[in-house]
């Protein structure tokens, strides 16, 4: 059985406490790594502080070279990384390869952003006090960054913390999910092969108590967290004076109007609703369909959902595999059962087998049901008809979350209305809310988070403006 060392202060080390990594599909341990102790974390912090000035002074072209190298090697070694990711997360292999390619692209975007780090020369004589003076504005790294990544995209969502930190010149300590730590520890091998200062990056699986130091320790100047709203907002309350960026998920809505291309809407909704068993914070959880086409859309949607192939994530033909663990599968089962007892109807799925929960479609739901009001984070979609576009917008907004929404329409006025009125961080036209490319601003409002990811936007969060006046 392979053991992965953790990456602490620029060195690969073992510790006294092993961490078993379970394959969700087989429910068996397939590899081991180690928990970092509080002493290991202190070593990583100390080393990061020692190299902080070196990172700040590292020329942009050197940062570019490091990021470009990592990007190129991820693409070259895609099979190696995808296998690790699929085994630890239960993600079907074709989606695991897709995530590695996204990570390759995210590092590449970060490399390119190194060439355009902001700065400006400005005249100050707009008021009498500034006569004869000008300013030079530069952006400096904020300092040590703490990154906490989730299990569902264990590589790419970690890269969204690592890559901008390197581009900005910030040392970073990353805590991967203890369910899925191996892909980022494998990534550490590539980071270690670059010319970045040793200690600029540490990747440390930690238990909750040790990991909480990333939140409360004032030596960290920015905390970037991706995870549940409950945990994220507690972290913000405990984070003190450091900057905080939160990406916290949601229960994304999708609107299908009567002018929509139904063929495309059905195909897109199936992917948006059930990719990675719905364990995506922007999965199309609530779908609202114009009443004129509701019956046709529902029938065609269910027909396509029933075609999805369930199976071993290592099989290239598998489209749906297990959830991350049986506890989450049981939670989803309980939420669906509760909805049914309150009047909802299952028109597809509704069955659990161990860590599997079969793709499930519900109708006749009510807004206060958990499957509507909370983040299911599982393979469950609700379908409801709407009478007017304004009603559909109101239903999507009737949520504590506001990450992204999808709108299928060929009416430009409806597109503009949706963009103006939907209370979300992103409006996706003629696609599902699951759409994301890694350089766009990504984040939400309300309980869905604070701040934005997307390399350029993350880099700006990780830098501070300083002005020289003369």
List PLM regions with ranges.
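Residue-level signal for inorganic ion chemistry
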Residues: 27, 63, 85, 107, ...
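Conserved C-terminal structural/oligomerization subdomain of aldehyde/semialdehyde dehydrogenase
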Residues: 28-32, 255, 309, 341, ...
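Short, well-ordered beta-strand elements within core beta-sheets of diverse protein domains
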Residues: 30-36, 51-57, 147, 254-257, ...
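Glycine-rich loop-to-alpha-helix module at the N-terminal edge of alpha/beta enzyme cores
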Residues: 30-118
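Rossmann-like NAD(P) dinucleotide-binding subdomain of oxidoreductase/dehydrogenase enzymes
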Residues: 123-264, 386
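A short hydrophobic/small-residue beta-strand
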Residues: 171-173, 346, 426
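ALDH superfamily catalytic-core signature
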Residues: 230-366, 429
